[in-house]
Amino acid sequence: FGKSLLVSTLACYYDRTKAHRFEELFGDTWIGNHPTKEHNRYMIIRYDFSAMVMSDHIQGLAQNFNDLNCGPVEVMVAHNRDLFGDFEFSNRGDASKMLEEVLTYARSHELPKVYILIDEYDNFTNQLLTAYNDPLYEEVTTNDSFLRTFFKVIKKGIGEGSIRTCFCTGVLPVTMDDLTSGYNIAEILTLEPNFLNMLGFTYEETETYLRYVLDKYSTGQDRFDEIWQLIVSNYDGYRFRPNGDRLFNATILTYFFKKFAANAGSIPDELVDENLRTDIHWIRRLTLSLDNAKTMLDALVIDNELPYNVADLASKFNKKKFFDKEFYPISLFYLGMTTLKDKFVTTLPNMTMRSVYMDYYNQLNKIEGNAQ
């Protein structure tokens, strides 16, 4: 929920070239009033793998990866030209070598450390999985592939002290696990108790948010109970540990408030953000067969329960385990399709997700009907 916004926040907070804007960007916030010693101390390289252009062969992916990821390194040097002087790249066109050049220069000239941000690190590898292109996925994540080489450069930079942190966002820990020794220093924060509430809005935060919206865009607090019940039914219910707090989905709640404000306080006709709908291909790919998909959806749509093994609630797992039938509940949980009801059962968190699942259910039945 809001992964890219978090990346933007970190970029602005740690970028040394934005120190003059710290008060403007963060002055009225908690982190602005309680700054750490590290704010605005680093050189930022920000990657976004979601813009990766796909290809059906490894050479094409490698070229597209370099085309996309040389730019962020060049931008960092341009923004910090006061430190890089007359530095010029000698390996333009190769994202890993350009990053390595910058890190070597920074270390040898005792420059501030580099802070690397990678948004949607697994976007294009997940696309390979949903397209059933497992052989190409294996090529990308094994041996000396361009992706493993890239993360090896980052690992080396962290070890040598030229990189302060590499913070990645993504959907699944599968790719990170399958990279194995290429990047075996990653720490998965998703299920850490201190970070859970970053994944959504608490009840207290949502109440504050709603009261603000009502005051500014509606008739005032007289509608609080009405709207509160609506958003609890549709956007609440996410729990990321069995004993964790229930959270609102920040993305779809904000979608509702934006529509509510644009309609001058009228409840929008469409309560479901279309961006919430995970592609039906994920369901088909995950379950491997139509029968498996229907069995799984029956359990969720009809019973609203899918048993899971709490021991499987791990922060890392590989591709083989992700597609294991016994692991479906955890796989769906990581895809954001279900949430934890307790230590034994996953469930649909709210009416919005039930609506989405009903659409999946109907699509699969239609697929079956057409096949017959």
Can you say where each PLM-predicted feature lies in the sequence?
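Extended alpha-helical interface modules used as scaffolds for assembling large macromolecular complexes
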Residues: 186-187, 246-372
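Hydrophobic positions on the alpha1 helix immediately C-terminal to the Walker A/P-loop
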Residues: 6
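Structural recognition of the conserved hydrophobic beta-strand(s) that form the central parallel beta-sheet
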Residues: 46, 115-119, 148-152, 163-171
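Conserved P-loop NTPase "ATPase switch" module shared by AAA+ and STAND
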Residues: 110-140
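P-loop NTPase motor core
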Residues: 12-78
